[in-house]
Amino acid sequence: MEVLESGEQGVLQWDRKLSELSEPGDGEALMYHTHFSELLDEFSQNVLGQLLNDPFLSEKSVSTEVEPSPMSPAPLIQAEHSYSLCEEPRAQSPFTHITTSDSFNDDEVESEKWYLSTDFPSTTIKTEPITDEPPPGLVPSVTLTITAISTPFEKEEPPLEMNTGVDSSCQTIIPKIKLEPHEVDQFLNFSPKEAPVDHLHLPPTPPSSHGSDSEGSLSPNPRLHPFSLPQTHSPSRAAPRAPSALSSSPLLTAPHKLQGSGPLVLTEEEKRTLIAEGYPIPTKLPLTKSEEKALKKIRRKIKNKISAQESRRKKKEYMDSLEKKVESCSTENLELRKKVEVLENTNRTLLQQLQKLQTLVMGKVSRTCKLAGTQTGTCLMVVVLCFAVAFGSFFQGYGPYPSATKMALPSQHSLQEPYTASVVRSRNLLIYEEHSPPEEPSSPGSAGELGGWDRGSSLLRVSGLESRPDVDLPHFIISNETSLEKSVLLELQQHLVSAKLEGNETLKVVELDRRVNTTF
């Protein structure tokens, strides 16, 4: 079994190169009147564009093909994953690699398979290193491009919508199945090391509810053949798994219907895929090795197509939700901008009102301050005036002549002198005579003046005044000294007796003593 499986792996590796040497334009013999591409959707046309490059689609035998040189590098097993459109220039149309012989039976497939398995032992494949960068043209890059669709498929898309009723009728008849992902890997002998992720250019798909290729590649027993196990293991192995999208889809046949003996009923999707790949449609059980391998291969491709459709659906839903969020955010942004503009306008108006109020308040404050200043000045002036009036009346008794008016009455009351009707002595003449030196002769003028003074003294005697002898007195003698406090000495004048005496004349000072006596 190890040699057989390794031989099959070699066939899978080398037929990708040999299929490119096949002649185009031979595949119209196996086509029905209604082409199979009309029954496929747009995604299946994209996916199955490169699936037709297979060893069973070539008319020529492998013995007539070009023998590969032992030194040429073996392509990676990723060639089986080239179910999407390839951007290499040598990618042919899906119709170019379909065989023209309608009598393609299982015996020829088995003989061809055994022939190739003996020519390519397993040791030669295992010893060859796997390069990170495969040669161009041998291993296509797995890239999905929606726009890169060939023109024959685009022209045949309208009939595809007309045949949807046939598919729905077939889906109601076919029972629901469940395909384990690791069963496909058991036939294809895949491992995670043989299919690195670096060569895949597909975007990461979101996690789906059904099984995918990654689940099948992580199978713990990839070398075990499913038909070598008892038939009772299939339902027990499928029981603990959760229900997936494949179990509810009628695109795949149930695994238990592929075992045993009897007629085999495949789904329409499996039949279309087998025809597109160039494989014969098996009709009875048990299946041969080639039929079993072909059926597992197309079942794997159908499951990958369903997974891609699910991922696209989820991606579309995600993008729709993002678009809705963007629209809502844009509308909200516009509303917020309008609100900001309204708030800015209100802020401007409020600032203008605030400035007006500030100017009004400042004007009122300045007026009140001025009024308060004038009122304060007026009050101070009134207070000063009141103080001036009060203190002026108080200090009026301290004038220059207070004794003549105010001090006379209390002094008169205090003395209480009796009224005398006798002669009141009111005035006194004080005479001070200076005797001339004896050697100077007396002039007649001076004698006349002395005679005048003598006559004055005689008048004083007549009036009753006592005359005093002429004696030299050192100072004046006041005869009446009764009321000295009330007397006011007034110096009326100083008489220059005579300027003609030439310094020898005597100066006479007449002082008047005024004595004011008031009577009541």
Swiss-Prot record:
Cross-link Glycyl lysine isopeptide (Lys-Gly) (interchain with G-Cter in SUMO2): residue positions: 178
Region (Basic motif): 296-325
Pfam families: bZIP_1
Regions crossing the membrane: 379-399
Recorded coiled-coil stretches: none
Cytoplasmic side: 1-378
Residues annotated as domain bZIP: 294-357
Low complexity bias: start-end ranges: 208-220, 234-255
Glycosylation sites: 480, 504, 517
GO cellular component annotations of the record: endoplasmic reticulum; endoplasmic reticulum membrane; nucleus
Alphabetized SMART domains for the sequence: BRLZ
Post-translational modification (record): Upon ER stress, translocated to the Golgi apparatus, where it is processed by regulated intramembrane proteolysis (RIP) to release the cytosol-facing N-terminal transcription factor domain. The cleavage is performed sequentially by site-1 and site-2 proteases (S1P/MBTPS1 and S2P/MBTPS2).
GO terms (BP aspect): cartilage development; chondrocyte differentiation; response to endoplasmic reticulum stress; response to unfolded protein
Modified residues (Phosphoserine): 93, 191
Subcellular location: Endoplasmic reticulum membrane
Membrane topology, record value: Single-pass type II membrane protein
Function: Transcription factor involved in unfolded protein response (UPR). In the absence of endoplasmic reticulum (ER) stress, inserted into ER membranes, with N-terminal DNA-binding and transcription activation domains oriented toward the cytosolic face of the membrane. In response to ER stress, transported to the Golgi, where it is cleaved in a site-specific manner by resident proteases S1P/MBTPS1 and S2P/MBTPS2. The released N-terminal cytosolic domain is translocated to the nucleus to effect transcription of specific target genes.
Subunit structure: Binds DNA as a dimer.
Protein name as annotated: Cyclic AMP-responsive element-binding protein 3-like protein 2
Organism for this UniProt entry: Pongo abelii (Sumatran orangutan)
Encoding gene (name): CREB3L2
